[in-house]
Amino acid sequence: MKILVLSTGGTIGSATKDGVMSPDKNATALLVLLYESSFQDVAEFDCESVSDILSENVTEPFYEKLINRLLAVDTEKYDGVIVLHGTDTLAYTSSLAAMVCRSLPIPVGFVGANYPLKHPKSKAFVNFRAAVEYLKAGGRGFFVPYENSDGKTYIHLATRLTEADFLHDDFHSLGDAVLAEFKDGKIIFSNDSRLPSQEELSKPLSGITDGEFELSGRVVLLKSYPGLDYSELRIKHDNVCAVV
């Protein structure tokens, strides 16, 4: 099995020095080396850097670069892709990629961590291992593995993932419907009827773009709340093409 590992930065791609966390170009290589030294595995890894940014700072150019790299993956060469990504916007990126890159015939996982790899509380290694084991077990689709504060590691369908909660930094899926659980070194598929089956996930859908993917920054998202006075809102039509 050959896996392409794409690093984008984030906490999982960072290191802490003198109490300050910053991107570390060696983080991905260290994570893969730690995995390879811990398990006599059949998996081979190719590592590539797409970006080196904390995920709360991502913009449209970041998404365009990552999506276009995924669309260009040699699916004859690789059995799967693992994207290392920050947790702050993990739900946004994984869901967007799942929708735009739905024509890919190979599975794509998004792996993040709450602390840098060398921190004793980091979940980088277990989340990465869960992603590899999911691929080895024949798991399909766009997925996100994450170990929560209760010690349980779930494999989420990317399009059902919610943002991490503010109390424990745990990740959940809508309705708690997950693809699988990673337990005792093994993947246990849930076969939840509320989610697409592994067979359905293995069938690529028609692509939504024929050329380079471009993400418009001219869409405004309004989050309503009780008492919001819409009459006070002023939107310059020249700069906006849609309002959600």
What are these regions (language model features)?
Residues M1-A242:
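Active-site histidine-anchored catalytic micro-motif
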